[in-house]
């Protein structure tokens, strides 16, 4: 049983979009984030959950992605307008932690050719996994553009040591219905991951990058 109503979410989405439309135009696309505060959860003792959800509409169309590819996928990446690195490029990093950290910070997500994915831990160590950015595999038969869109549309709820999470659920260019739907889908999915469902939810807030927070719960 959901504790938030569609109409309540819609009211807040209206306010959020109104604020964004009426304030100074930003020179970037503002992301709309769902910020979650948990309660009655002990990250030390309770199972730390992790789950991914593919949203119907991509929340961050300009999310930066890099492809670790063989020659075939490096070529395909260029035609998709996505950055790519070959095995030689990865070897040049020489397992240098600073350089790998810089790479991990530069991109929001990574995709790797299936043939390379097993080499990633050997070439780059555990850094990408620790940052929650281990590459998504892609095969030569997959549509690479579709895979990039999938990665951009997938959000991840992962409990670490602190009891708050934030995920991108949309952007301020979306229409009201789309944004409401994406928020409700994300909330329901998150609640399904929690041990005691709604009893573990302390607060739910939506916020655009530069706008104020609107409380849903």
From Swiss-Prot:
GO CC, alphabetical: large ribosomal subunit
Pfam short name (any one): Ribosomal_L1
GO terms assigned for molecular function: RNA binding; structural constituent of ribosome
CDD domains: Ribosomal_L1
Keywords recorded for this protein, A-Z: Ribonucleoprotein, Ribosomal protein
Family in the record: Belongs to the universal ribosomal protein uL1 family.
PANTHER family in the record: RIBOSOMAL PROTEIN L7AE FAMILY MEMBER
Protein name (record): Large ribosomal subunit protein uL1
Gene behind the chain: RPL10A
């Amino acid at each position: 049983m959901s504790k938030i109503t569609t109409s309540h979410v819609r009211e807040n989405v209206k306010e959020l979009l109104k604020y964004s439309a009426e304030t100074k135009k930003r020179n970037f696309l503002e992301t709309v984030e769902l910020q979650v505060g948990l309660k009655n959860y002990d990250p030390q003792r309770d199972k730390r959950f992790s789950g991914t959800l593919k949203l119907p509409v991509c929340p961050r169309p300009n999310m930066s992605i890099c492809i670790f590819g063989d020659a075939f996928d490096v070529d395909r990446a260029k035609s998709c307008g996505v950055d790519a690195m070959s095995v030689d490029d990865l070897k040049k990093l020489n397992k240098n932690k600073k350089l790998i950290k810089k790479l991990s910070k530069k991109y929001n997500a990574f995709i790797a050719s299936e043939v390379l994915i097993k080499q990633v831990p050997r070439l780059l160590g555990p850094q990408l996994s620790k940052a929650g950015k281990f590459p998504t595999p892609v095969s030569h038969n997959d549509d690479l553009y579709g895979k990039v869109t999938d990665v951009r549309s997938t959000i991840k709820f992962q409990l670490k040591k602190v009891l708050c999470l934030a995920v991108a659920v949309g952007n301020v260019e979306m229409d009201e219905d789309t944004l409401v739907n994406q928020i409700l889908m994300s909330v329901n999915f998150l609640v399904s991951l929690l041990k005691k469902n709604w009893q573990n939810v302390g607060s739910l807030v939506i916020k655009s990058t530069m706008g104020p927070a609107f409380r849903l719960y």
